[in-house]
Curated annotation (Swiss-Prot):
Native source organism of the sequence: Helicobacter pylori (strain ATCC 700392 / 26695) (Campylobacter pylori)
Gene Ontology biological-process annotations: translation
HAMAP family xref list: Ribosomal_bL25_CTC (MF_01334)
CDD domains according to UniProt: Ribosomal_L25_TL5_CTC
Positions of disulphide bridges: none
Functional note: This is one of the proteins that binds to the 5S RNA in the ribosome where it forms part of the central protuberance.
Domain of life assignment: Bacteria
Complex and partners: Part of the 50S ribosomal subunit; part of the 5S rRNA/L5/L18/L25 subcomplex. Contacts the 5S rRNA. Binds to the 5S rRNA independently of L5 and L18.
Gene Ontology MF annotations: 5S rRNA binding; structural constituent of ribosome
Name of the protein described by the UniProt record: Large ribosomal subunit protein bL25
GO cellular component, one term: cytosolic large ribosomal subunit
Lineage of origin: Bacteria, Pseudomonadati, Campylobacterota, Epsilonproteobacteria, Campylobacterales
Gene: rplY
SUPFAM superfamilies, A to Z: Ribosomal protein L25-like
Length: 178
């Protein structure tokens, strides 16, 4: 479980001092809870996010424990370093909006026909309760030929999960190389 510290002061000077000490500024918020301003050690946070198996993960700030999902993050445009993260605290049985990653498997047939695999969307917006949240959508791209694509409506349907993106949006496809 990730452990962080609660920020007593939310001033700019305090944030700069924490960043200088290797901390990542974070906000935890959600339906029915008071916003918590916190900070996590940057490197352990990134390592934990890369190793986690589920979208929802536990964090501890002070003496409070939250089940959270990364809602939004900000990176430094020059160094590409993570500088801020918003964590949405989830409550079982309460529907929320999430962004679920799309993973693909297989090698498209169209690559042999001088095509290029084009990822149009990396994440799909869904609305559901946290206990029904899929960890990812897996797309098999092996049957795709040149000028073919997989649309949102072609994704597998999960029970109690509503996809918010329009069903005619392309998720992944193979285009002809020029």
């Amino acid at each position: 479980m990730l452990e962080g510290v609660i920020r007593e002061s939310i001033t700019k000077a305090n944030a700069k001092a924490l960043k200088k000490d290797g901390y990542l500024i974070a906000n935890v918020y959600g339906k029915g809870i008071e916003n918590v301003n916190g900070a996590f050690k940057l490197n352990p946070f990134i390592k934990y996010l890369k190793e986690k198996k589920h979208l929802i993960f536990p964090v501890k700030l002070g003496d409070k424990t939250f089940e959270v999902v990364v809602q939004e993050y900000q990176k430094n445009p020059v160094t590409n370093e993570l500088i801020h993260v918003d964590l949405l605290a989830v409550t079982k049985g309460v529907k929320s909006k999430f962004k679920v990653p799309i993973k693909h498997q297989g090698t498209p047939v169209g690559l042999k026909n001088k095509g290029i695999l084009m990822l149009s969307k990396k994440r799909i917006s869904v609305e559901c309760a946290p206990e029904h949240l899929p960890d990812h959508y897996l797309v098999d791209v092996a049957p795709l030929d040149v000028n073919e694509s997989i649309l949102v409506r072609d994704l597998e349907k999960h029970e109690n999960v509503k996809i918010l993106d329009h069903d005619s949006i392309a998720v992944i496809g193979v285009i002809k190389a020029k």
